[in-house]
């Protein structure tokens, strides 16, 4: 037990993790770009045990297709005071076969802005992990462990 009498971190089952993935609408795609990590927020859906999102030509497409990626989703429930996160690691592939494209186009997955997102990416999971924990009460959460430092110039 943690100092506050609650379990510090609960490891979620795969089923619980997928349940949270189905509830969220925005996740973060983590990729390597020019030997540097980068993160892209994307709206997505869970479909057939995988993550599906739409994108356009560009860095996100070039840095994800055919590569191992990480995909993270998190949330906070103010009524219970619990936060959670789920991470999927797997290979991203572009959906190209006609029957898969037609199925994906039937999903209620639409771009959030006017730029066309004609490419459909599917992340096939190799690992799924999730955690849930109780957030500290406000005074403890806002107490700095050390004095803040100025940002580098």
Descriptions of predicted regions:
Residues 108-153:
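Short, active-site-adjacent segments that bind or coordinate small-molecule cofactors and metal centers
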């Amino acid at each position: 037990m943690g100092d506050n009498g609650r379990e510090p971190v609960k490891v979620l089952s795969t089923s619980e993790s997928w349940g949270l993935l189905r509830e969220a609408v925005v996740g973060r795609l983590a990729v390597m770009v020019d030997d540097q990590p980068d993160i892209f927020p994307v709206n997505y859906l869970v479909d057939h045990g995988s993550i599906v999102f739409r994108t356009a030509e560009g860095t996100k497409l070039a840095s994800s297709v055919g590569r191992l990626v990480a995909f993270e989703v998190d949330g906070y429930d103010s009524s219970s005071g619990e936060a959670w996160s789920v991470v999927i690691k797997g290979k991203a592939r572009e959906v190209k076969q006609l029957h898969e494209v037609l199925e994906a186009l039937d999903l209620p997955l639409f771009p959030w802005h006017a730029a066309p997102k004609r490419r459909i990416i599917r992340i096939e999971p190799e690992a799924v992990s999730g955690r849930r924990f109780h957030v500290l009460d406000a005074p403890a959460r806002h107490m700095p462990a050390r004095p803040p430092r100025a940002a580098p110039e």
